[in-house]
């Protein structure tokens, strides 16, 4: 008995029909895409007061070009955490981009991942209680703190009743959300799903914590040149704020409502390392297995893959492990792009953002240049796209996302 796959009709055909994102380059995805193709960077010197207050070792990052809160009313600010406000903003934008379709709410799901959720409200609530006692804690504190809050806000906003879910798997959360949304659809539990990831803003505590792990770049004098995925001289990642969502649905559902698909979502692979809390397994075996599984479910072979959108954080061990994973999966012939070189790392949102970029590569037949890839690492044998955009006949692509805790997620996409 053969493995069921999208290619052999074992799973229904799933398509991507709308995308949206906000980034440190632009508040909309199409302008972000143009900026990436032009070699722009969203990473700059941070001017936040907390940088000098705490004399942080890392003084660079990428704030959103257009702050989420500039679109929020007074009640939104009081009743929702930051990621919930981002979810509301992006959910509305995505639905408008999709043409505000009429869908059956009982066949409509929402899956949105995050790394920390509304964690800032924990600190705020503690400070209020410390200053004035328990009665100063807002009755809305729980709903603002809960990690599933952003997905719940979108589900309420759009009326989704086929399930609202929130993967919390560190840096793979956004991609895992898309994977679970795909599963909801191919298992017959939904026809359409909003999926993606959101994350909080750059703050002092996360910078301090990741810096103490020696995971972040300290090239403070060269912000735009700091994030150097796969480069021999890479020294860590840089934070870059973002949020991203996509609308996926069965091809049959999309055609029935007259939607124009952007790409196909063909398969999703999820594995774990069982190796270390924060370090990837250097051999890349289980990460590579996630890639292989996504191809199996898609009905593709490694030779079919023209492009890999890499997790590429620019940490010395992470990039080397990913290169091994790509080799293990047999996809080392593919053209590789590392978006974090330009956009930085948005933790729970980044997998969704990079999935959206993968869709745009397949739509437009072009891969943006990986910034700051100047000195190839002799230990990494990959075809990294750098210097200028690379145009080509890209049919199939894989997006990789790997998270602390040993989480590995790979998504297989196809040109429509």
Curated annotation (Swiss-Prot):
Residues carrying the site annotation Interacts with the inhibitor thiolactomycin: 171, 311, 345
Alphabetic keyword roster: Acyltransferase, Cytoplasm, Fatty acid biosynthesis, Fatty acid metabolism, Lipid biosynthesis, Lipid metabolism, Phosphoprotein, Transferase
Main location as per UniProt: cytoplasm
Regulation: Phosphorylation decreases the condensation activity.
An annotated GO cellular component: cytosol
InterPro entries recorded: Beta-ketoacyl_synthase, Ketoacyl_synth_C, Ketoacyl_synth_N, PKS_Beta-ketoAc_synthase_dom, Thiolase-like
Residues where substrate binds: 311, 345
Family stated for the protein in its record: Belongs to the thiolase-like superfamily. Beta-ketoacyl-ACP synthases family.
Name of this chain's protein: 3-oxoacyl-[acyl-carrier-protein] synthase 1
Organism of origin: Mycobacterium tuberculosis (strain ATCC 25618 / H37Rv)
Organismal lineage: Bacteria, Bacillati, Actinomycetota, Actinomycetes, Mycobacteriales
